[in-house]
């Protein structure tokens, strides 16, 4: 059988080539792939939140609470560990979400928008303003002993919903605005993680910290000894999670720490992969007809696949593997478990009304004011410069989009409020403000943004990320 491919034709079957070509192009643009997944995830999050709200306010509302409080546990001899299904989602599955967040932060610091000070200045200023102003506004409106603990709720931006809104605006949104929003959200997440670790954790138990340190050191040691199998890291990662939990710190912090220490450098690199793959494939090409056995072919393909695997950093590989599961599995389940707020016809009491109003105001008013004001101040003081293709119109849309604070805001609300009525009020404020912010962002985007790009603007998100024009 001839192995010669006519000029201009693919060696792959026609029916397989087109989708594989699209897949390879998408895989070759990691940031665009990330934003595609986030946009689709935002739609799924909206559906999950709507289902939760309808379920919690339907004739079957009791089944909603009963379902999420279903006890789950393990028993080994005299040892019993039992928690509710809601706890499994919020403290267990969300640790994987925070693990991916930790890796994304590390990647951005290593090679993304946060890798250079002059590139990171604008999103850092925007994120800082977008955290401080909402928190300050919340405390201004809800500075009582019962309500002030919720100051951290309106601080974070939900990247999935925010990217989904920008996607609905289509070609009006310049790629540089998407990249700036992503960098802002990454710093927002980092700020929220610090807030959770410092302000929303109970008293620290030293024994638990020692167990957590043992797990983290185990992960680090395995990395240093070159352990490649992802499955091998499950045991030390679980030890770290259990230690952080028993220490009185929220266990999702363990996911963040392990994500931050996941290597972002490749073992082989692009050049090494090209050299290795070319060498292996040349051996096949030089074989005489009948000399190439299926065993030799499979061994060659195995080595090429190993080279492909080693050409990707562990962080990049894990993000590519876990991000779809987090975006389309864990986050919608979290929304389903936490967005079911009973809406009563009875008026809220004073404390609940204060929490709902302060939370909604912090997100809907404080976020845009903080983001836009901090950007203006940083530009005025020449601490940062705008990316090519962006102006104040785009920053107005950025600020309004940043007011969508769904996943992280609901998560912090779970930690901030111990009283059921205050937790429900906080969630109600988050849902109302996020919905209103989404509408405002869409209206402003349609009004302020045009389909014609500014001179010098990047044409894709990866080109915008690579640009050093900041």
Curated annotation (Swiss-Prot):
Any GO MF annotation of the entry: sodium:proton antiporter activity
Cellular component, GO, one term: plasma membrane
Subcellular location: Cell inner membrane
Coiled-coil residues: none
UniProtKB keywords: Antiport, Cell inner membrane, Cell membrane, Ion transport, Membrane, Sodium, Sodium transport, Transmembrane, Transmembrane helix, Transport
Gene Ontology biological process terms in this record: regulation of pH
Mode of membrane association: Multi-pass membrane protein
Superkingdom of origin organism: Bacteria
Residues spanning the membrane: 34-54, 85-105, 121-141, 150-170, 179-199, 202-222, 241-261, 317-337, 357-377, 395-415, 423-443
Catalytic activity: Na(+)(in) + 2 H(+)(out) = Na(+)(out) + 2 H(+)(in)
InterPro entries: Na/H_antiporter_dom_sf, NhaA
Family membership noted in the UniProt record: Belongs to the NhaA Na(+)/H(+) (TC 2.A.33) antiporter family.
Task of the protein: Na(+)/H(+) antiporter that extrudes sodium in exchange for external protons.
Name the UniProt record assigns to this protein: Na(+)/H(+) antiporter NhaA 2
Organism whose genome encodes this protein: Myxococcus xanthus (strain DK1622)
């Amino acid at each position: 059988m001839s192995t010669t491919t006519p000029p201009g034709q693919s060696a792959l079957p026609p029916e397989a080539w087109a989708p594989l070509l699209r897949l390879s192009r998408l895989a070759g643009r990691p940031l665009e792939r990330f934003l595609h997944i986030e946009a689709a995830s935002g739609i799924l999050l909206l559906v999950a939140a709507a289902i939760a709200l309808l379920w919690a306010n339907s004739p079957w509302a009791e089944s909603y609470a009963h379902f999420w409080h279903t006890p789950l546990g393990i028993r080994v001899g005299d040892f019993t560990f039992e928690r509710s299904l809601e706890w499994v989602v919020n403290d267990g599955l969300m640790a994987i979400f925070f693990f991916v967040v930790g890796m994304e932060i590390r990647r951005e610091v290593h090679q993304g928008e946060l890798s250079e000070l002059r590139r990171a200045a604008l999103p850092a200023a925007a994120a800082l303003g977008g955290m401080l102003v909402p928190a300050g506004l919340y405390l201004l409106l809800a500075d009582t002993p019962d309500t002030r603990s919720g100051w951290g709720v309106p601080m974070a931006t939900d990247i999935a919903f925010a990217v989904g809104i920008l996607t609905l605006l289509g070609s009006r949104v310049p790629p540089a605005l998407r990249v700036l929003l992503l960098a802002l959200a990454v710093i927002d997440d980092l700020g929220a993680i610090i807030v959770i670790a410092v302000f929303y954790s109970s008293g620290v138990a030293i024994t638990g910290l020692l167990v957590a340190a043992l797990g983290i050191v185990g992960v680090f040691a395995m990395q240093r000894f070159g352990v490649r199998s992802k499955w091998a890291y499950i045991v030390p990662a679980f030890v770290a999670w259990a230690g952080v939990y028993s220490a009185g710190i929220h266990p999702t912090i363990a996911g963040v720490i392990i994500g931050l220490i996941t290597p972002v450098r490749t073992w082989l690199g692009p050049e090494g992969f090209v050299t290795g793959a070319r060498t292996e494939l040349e051996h096949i090409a030089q074989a005489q007809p009948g000399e190439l056995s299926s065993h030799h072919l499979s061994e060659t393909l195995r080595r090429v696949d190993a080279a492909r695997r080693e050409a990707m950093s562990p962080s990049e590989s894990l993000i590519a593997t876990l991000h779809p599961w987090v975006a389309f599995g864990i986050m919608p389940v979290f929304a389903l478990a936490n967005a079911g707020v009973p809406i009563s016809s009875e008026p809220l009491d004073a404390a609940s009304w204060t929490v709902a109003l302060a939370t909604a105001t912090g997100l809907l008013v404080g976020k845009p004011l903080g983001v836009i004001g901090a950007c203006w101040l940083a530009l005025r003081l020449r601490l940062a410069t705008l990316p090519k293709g962006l102006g104040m119109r785009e920053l107005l849309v950025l600020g309004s989009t940043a007011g969508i604070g769904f996943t992280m805001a609901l998560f912090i609300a779970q930690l901030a409020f111990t009283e059921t009525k205050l937790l429900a009020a906080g969630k109600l404020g988050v849902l109302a403000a996020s919905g209103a912010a989404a509408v405002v962002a869409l209206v402003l985007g349609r009004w302020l943004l045009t389909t014609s790009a500014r001179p010098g603007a990047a044409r894709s998100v990866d080109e915008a990320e690579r640009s050093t024009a900041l």
